[in-house]
Amino acid sequence: MTHLFEGVGVALTTPFTNNKVNLEALKAHVNFLLENNAQAIIVNGTTAESPTLTTDEKELILKTVIDLVDKRVPVIAGTGTNDTEKSIQASIQAKALGADAIMLITPYYNKTNQRGLVKHFEAIADAVKLPVVLYNVPSRTNMTIEPETVEILSQHPYIVALKDATNDFEYLEEVKKRIDTNSFALYSGNDDNVVEYYQRGGQGVISVIANVIPKEFQALYDAQQSGLDIQDQFKPIGTLLSALSVDINPIPIKALTSYLGFGNYELRLPLVSLEDTDTKVLREAYDTFKAGENE
């Protein structure tokens, strides 16, 4: 079995203009990603501000992306919530719209235990019968999918990958011991750790920064797969990532996507844009990165 994708999947932002989803900007952004070697597009995830999107908006965004991508790369829909039945219904709708896979975050707020996680994820996978990417992000959910639980879930025929945003390499190694990486993919959920994540056998990354540098971030993965040492190649990307860490995702990345012309620099409350001085510094860091490419 091949993996859902290898290399860089982009956690897509949602462009707004006057607080409305800007479909033309969305299409322009997706075209930019496809032209610059993105290997998958993840829609309606954390970076998309999914908590503040309506159901109708999520479906419109997903349908727009699916139609535009036209099977050139996988489109993965973020459909997970802390309500199993709502997650099932959202996932069924995503499948009906043509999504290639779904991504399911661990339940948050009400949370659960590990047995509950197994039942939650398996119930959705059983109902939808579409490839599932588990999304483990304890910094946002205060809930983790333990390695033993990943092992159980990896045996389900439709649960095929883990987005690992733990930034914990001991966790990665424990998971690796328990799964078949030929059929179950491990994707980093942290752009800043990809060098070591790839060295330790990860199949790719679900990336924020790839919204603006997809080609360069995919080139990093390709170089690693070719057996090259990518530490030096990563350094300018690492500098840009440091600038991007000025605030909570997706606040900074939208300062850059808007800079590239993909919608206004707008977020929905409770998220707010960077201060003007921070926006200027971040955009200058992007300009410096791009200028370095041309030297």
From Swiss-Prot:
It is an enzyme of class 4 (lyase). Is insensitive to lysine-feedback inhibition. Shows ASA substrate inhibition. It is found in: Cytoplasm. The active site is at Y135, K163. Its main location: cytoplasm. One of its GO terms (biological process) is lysine biosynthetic process via diaminopimelate. It comes from the Bacteria. Keywords: Amino-acid biosynthesis, Cytoplasm, Diaminopimelate biosynthesis, Lyase, Lysine biosynthesis, Schiff base. Homodimer. In fact, exists in a monomer-dimer equilibrium in solution, shifted in favor of the dimer in presence of the substrate pyruvate; the monomer has significantly reduced activity compared with the dimer. Belongs to the DapA family. This is 4-hydroxy-tetrahydrodipicolinate synthase. It comes from Staphylococcus aureus (strain MRSA252).
